[in-house]
Amino acid sequence: MKKITVLVDLYYLKAAVAGIGSYIREFEASCNDHGSNDFKYVFTHDINKLVGNSIFLNSNNKIIRWIFQIRYLIYKQIQLPLKILFSKADYVICPDYIAPYFTFKAKRITVLHDSLFWDHKKNYSFLWNKYFISLINLGMNKGTQIITTSNYSKKNLIKILGSDKSISSVYQSFNFLKTSSSNYKTPENYLLHIGSFEKRKDLITLVKAFKLVDDPNLKLVLAGAQIIN
């Protein structure tokens, strides 16, 4: 029986520090560790050459960031379609919001992690936000399967994209059996927030709200990567 070929796009790992970067790394590892024998997973890049080895990673240089966006556009609309064609992929998975316009016979599975680009436009420049949303829409057709990371995001995306879109929520997993020796001394009772330290996350409001909690034994722990923007 012929295996179903699934092409997984790893390109965005060149620039992703936290959220999407973690998602891509864990997805790639899961495909290798838990993939079905009925599927053949093909990766667009060698992940070991991408992780922590890019000038685009968390750069505060606007020129470098724009160079990445130009290369990203060329890759998505020209190079990735060629990879789809030559790999004879049945499915292509894009974990970074954007799928190419041409996927030939391959069905598209696109991960929209949330609806922030539509809900919080003030966090992005007008032109960039309009451009990015246009790219998202360009990569979607009637057969696109959209994956998001929570039911909350699913409801928001249905309101934005329409109920005719196929949207499924798949929560990100956690290995409760895996333990590690940590040097971090966490309190006995605490609330944990995991996410990058970005202005748009509005962590200041979270800290102010926690300050109102009348429980001296409860602590707030923030964990995540520092992002330049």
Map each language-model feature to its residues:
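Carbohydrate transferase catalytic cores enriched for Leloir-type hexosyltransferases
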Residues: 1-229
